[in-house]
């Protein structure tokens, strides 16, 4: 039974329909020569273009029919949450997913890398409004410009919207299921270090008074540098969207060789 204090599937359907005009949008302000792509790996281009896309996202406001306006944010200017406010009053956090375009000639390595898109620790149960907040996940790829095929630009070809509170809860459940924990009031997510795992296996008490940033510090917990990667969040809807394009995602180095207990 739907919870009245949470964004409903009907509301997400409404938002999804409102945002449909985004599909096909091409950011020609970012133009790359097709020939230059041959020297780059997809992951390298994704990093470069993704950074530039973040800077150009305010241009989405130039599509009035979708009703998105930049939100003032509640966490400061650069890292403000959420990114947008919809004309309906819904709040939208934007995430970008780079998809490799197999029709473009690039330097493709034999080993793929895990997508870097993530739901970071800046978004927690403390600042998410369960009734109004959604995540907009935009899948984009480089496509030739119609007027000048020798140039390619990032182009939105698919998107999905999700309940933000559901994603945050799924992300945090995975952290705990893997033996991790939060330090502070949802400030720093940590995972067991090699020392911590050894102590746990030996039945010894863990020291949860501090954490480290690297193994050499000898702490029982280390900061989780992979926290919130979308590929690792056990949410059925999110996984279904990622699976649609799995063939062209950078999907290796999954869980540092460990099974995901929540998968």
Question: Which residues are covered by each model-predicted region?
Answer:
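Nucleic-acid endonuclease domains
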Residues: 1-82, 96-263
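Active-site beta-strand-loop-beta-strand hairpin of nuclease catalytic cores
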Residues: 82-94
């Amino acid at each position: 039974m739907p919870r009245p204090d949470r964004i409903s599937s009907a509301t997400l359907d409404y938002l999804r329909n409102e945002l449909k005009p985004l599909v096909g949008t091409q950011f020609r302000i970012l133009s790359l020569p097709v020939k230059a792509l041959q020297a780059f790996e997809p992951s390298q281009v994704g990093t470069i273009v993704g950074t530039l896309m973040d800077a150009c996202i305010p241009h989405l406001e130039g599509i009035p029919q979708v009703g998105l306006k930049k939100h003032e944010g509640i966490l400061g200017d650069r890292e403000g949450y959420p990114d947008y406010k919809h004309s309906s009053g819904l709040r939208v956090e934007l995430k970008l997913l780079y998809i490799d375009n197999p029709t473009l000639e690039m330097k493709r390595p034999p080993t793929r890398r895990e997508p870097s898109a993530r739901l970071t620790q800046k978004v927690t149960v403390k600042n998410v409004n369960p009734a109004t907040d959604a995540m907009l996940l935009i899948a984009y790829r480089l496509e030739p410009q119609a007027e000048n095929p020798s140039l390619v630009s990032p182009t939105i070809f698919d998107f999905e919207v999700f309940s933000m509170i559901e994603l945050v809860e799924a992300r945090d459940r995975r952290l705990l299921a893997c033996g991790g924990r939060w330090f502070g009031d949802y400030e720093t997510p940590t995972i067991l270090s090699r020392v911590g795992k050894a102590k746990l296996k030996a039945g010894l008490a863990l020291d949860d008074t501090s954490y480290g940033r690297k193994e050499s510090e000898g702490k029982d917990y280390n900061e989780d540098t992979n926290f919130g990667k979308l590929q690792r969040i056990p949410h059925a809807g999110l996984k279904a969207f990622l699976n649609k394009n799995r063939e062209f995602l950078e999907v290796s180095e999954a869980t540092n060789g460990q099974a995901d207990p929540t998968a």
